[in-house]
Amino acid sequence: MQYRDLRDFIRGLEQRGELKRIQVPISPVLEMTEVCDRTLRAKGPALLFEKPTGFDIPVLGNLFGTPERVAMGMGAESVEELREIGKLLAFLKEPEPPKGLKDAWSKLPIFKKVVSMAPKVVKDAVCQEVVVEGDDVDLGQLPIQHCWPGDVAPLITWGLTVTRGPNKDRQNLGIYRQQVIGRNKVIMRWLSHRGGALDYREWCEKNPGQPFPVAVALGADPATILGAVTPVPDTLSEYAFAGLLRGNRTELVKCRGSNLQVPATAEIILEGVIHPGEMAPEGPYGDHTGYYNEVDSFPVFTVERITHRQKPIYHSTYTGRPPDEPAILGVALNEVFVPILQKQFPEIVDFYLPPEGCSYRMAVVTMKKQYPGHAKRVMLGVWSFLRQFMYTKFVIVTDDDINARDWNDVIWAITTRMDPKRDTVMIDNTPIDYLDFASPVSGLGSKMGLDATHKWPGETTREWGRVIVKDEAVTRRIDELWDQLGID
């Protein structure tokens, strides 16, 4: 089922028993985090806090707190269906030339559907029903969460940041946390390789000293939100991909103060600029690692205008030691990644990002090994093929008789098929997440690959052990007798 906007999604979740309205006053300061954390760990529903303490605007939390709700937001009926979305993205990322006329005709509907999902620009939008400008702008009117005791200030977490570089026709959508430092100022924490930061850098080079337009959409429809965190090919905009997920074109509206276009059905829009050179220290904040991050300097976003729907809903989350909402998103999006990787590396059978590994810092790959050194080729491919795995510190590669999602299997493979010196690959001075304080230098560290596959001639001179396999006939006979044995 597809959802036109966030409110439509809320109604759909409520009908399925997947959303709970909270009538008891709960504070955005620490209390919402506690409630959402307990609910997420219990695999509970999305939560709509209708009476946040001190505010008139309700807060939506734990929206994507289960993989099933992520799938629903992407228009799928099950997590397994996300593999089909991954296959579509794999095709669009590297489309193969048609093998003949029949093949060309079979692929034509896909391209026609993609073209037909180009965003639609509208003149009037519900996200601009109310306009607040100038001195009336006050972020303190929004129920922005203060998530952890050691956090320095309230933090905007689910904002879709919209930017456009000076040499680009296409806008970039990114989700970057934003620390509130005044009634109309937040710190835009984007890492240097992310799309928004690249757009800003190019703008400063081409338009030195000129303010850089930025917009932030809060409470967009689920397809647009999830499109911003999915590995969409560079040839496809996040808005067009959201249209594919939703089944109809994404409606956009021009900002009141710039040429940027924002989701027309969003709940709240922040419009403004970044003045080149205006920076501020950001943090510390509790993060998805389970630790408070270091303080670092990032650009300041000045909010010149807030537009919103009548009676808006504020969408929020928290990040902390897994499981948290980003970790659950990672579990679901894992299914999207698998077909994309298999398109490039057909030998890959499964790919798993354990959520306890902070969603991306460790990957387990199972493969059909075909030659000596094959596992090392795959691990290097994982690090280099998709930018989403640039910060993956550990890659474990095993044979296809191992279940990548079962640590009992994986640890058995590591301890029985690896020699630590021969089968460990270490790479120095590679890009590492800036939040990773374990690396010796901020943003630069090492990576480890573990080859836990059976070793082929050339990789070892010893006779390799044979895996114990039960006798199938005996297993069937004992299955038939089992109830008679009286063993509980």
From Swiss-Prot:
Q: How is the cofactor bound?
A: Binds 1 prenylated FMN per subunit.
Intracellular or extracellular location(s):
Cell membrane
InterPro entries linked: UbiD (IPR002830), UbiD-like_C (IPR049381), UbiD-like_N (IPR049383), UbiD_bacteria (IPR023677), UbiD_Rift_dom (IPR048304)
For membrane topology, the record states: Peripheral membrane protein
Q: Which reaction does it catalyse?
A: a 4-hydroxy-3-(all-trans-polyprenyl)benzoate + H(+) = a 2-(all-trans-polyprenyl)phenol + CO2
Residues annotated for Mn(2+) binding in this entry:
N172, E238
Listed pathway(s)? Cofactor biosynthesis; ubiquinone biosynthesis
SUPFAM superfamilies, per this entry? FMN-binding split barrel, UbiD C-terminal domain-like
Top EC class of this enzyme: lyase
Cofactors needed by this protein, per the record, are: prenylated FMN; Mn(2+)
- Please give the family membership noted in the entry: Belongs to the UbiD family.
- Briefly state the protein's biological role: Catalyzes the decarboxylation of 3-octaprenyl-4-hydroxy benzoate to 2-octaprenylphenol, an intermediate step in ubiquinone biosynthesis.
Q: Give the quaternary structure.
A: Homohexamer.
Please give the PANTHER family that the UniProt record associates with this protein: 3-OCTAPRENYL-4-HYDROXYBENZOATE CARBOXY-LYASE-RELATED, FERULIC ACID DECARBOXYLASE 1
Q: What is this protein called?
A: 3-octaprenyl-4-hydroxybenzoate carboxy-lyase
Its source organism is Pseudomonas putida (strain W619)
